[in-house]
Amino acid sequence: IMGFTKPIEHFILQRKKVITMNTLYVGIDVSSKSNVVYLMLPNGDKHSNFSVANSHEGSTQLVKRILSALTSHSLDTVLIGLEATSVYGDNLVYFLREDATLAPFNRKIHVLNPKQVKKFHDAYNDLPKNDYVDSFVIADCLRFGRINKEVYLGDYRYKALQNLTRARFFAVQNLIKEKQRFMNVLFKKYSTMTQEKVFSDTFSTTALAVYDEFDSAEALANMDLHELTDFIIEKGKNRFPDPDAVAKAIQKAARSSYRLPKTVNDSVNQVLSISITSMKALESQIKEFDKAIKAQMELLPNVLISIPGIGPVYSAGIMAEIGDINRFDNQAALAKYAGLAWKQHQSGSFEAEVTRLIPSGNRFLKYYLYEAAFSLVRCDKEYSDFYHLKYKEVNRCQHKRALALTARKFVRLVFRLLKDNRLYVPAK
């Protein structure tokens, strides 16, 4: 193979051969411009390796080479594997699934976790690292069959839903980061207001109006109290039970805040104004994603929406990442796929009491499971009791631990409802 310092046969002879008859293994190392391919015969021997462009024309050449190998060796099954490398492999997978010339053969496509492929690669101590070697390792992973593999979602409705739920995930993360940056800048203008809970919602319409429409902490502190109260009533649409008390709390915080030089204060005001505009735009994006997700969910059966507190958005985020529930043998396999499994730390007679979550897993699925579980805590007594029980068991990382364990419990419910295709019935 190009890039090997030793013949590939050297490495093949160093490992135990696992023979699966009548199967061609295709390892593909995907990049933005090219796809490096390794074709492996059932006994582990090399058939060929080559590179094609990551384009429609290049994929057509790839299929022709696969067909030639299948027919020349009288094989009836082809297993194709590639790593999950951002968006670069999606179009190739669509092409391979839709290509009619491969239809007569038993065709399966697997998108592999790059971390697991790397660990498989590390088992070969003297293998170099390049694209041609990577394609060989991927093909060998498929042949051994002892690596957790993700079969590509065959139902395009799930892929369409996944595009929306993942885009929403990134919009939410951007909003969180923008709010964090906003609070850092707000401290410069109203230092005490960020330290004390003046508003129940730091990012409410009234709060943002106070941050944005007053030039400085000094101007706010010197404003007539009645005028400030009227301002609070107007911006809060007369929903504050005691607007006069709110106005007094705001002025008290403004008086004890630092005073900035005018030049610095002006730049801070500009940053806050732009940040508020960005947050409103992101919130608008999230609402549009929610509408699109709800419309897409009408095309899919959804038993998860029967769970209290789990609306169409959270259920969509979960279902989009799971796809066909039959991909998972049991609820433990689903939990591990979501990264909700704990590492065992044991040696001799020692058994660690504190263990960590595994670092791998589908971060999108984990996010939506966490969000759904926390919503369920607020709406379902059984899950609320479980969360608070786990919360009280420890003195540190209470919420984080309790939420992870609640999400793990929720996985069992999700698996059973999807597996049996039945609605949720609360415990009596």
Where are these predicted regions, by residue range?
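A detector of single, family-specific signature residues
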Residues: 1-428
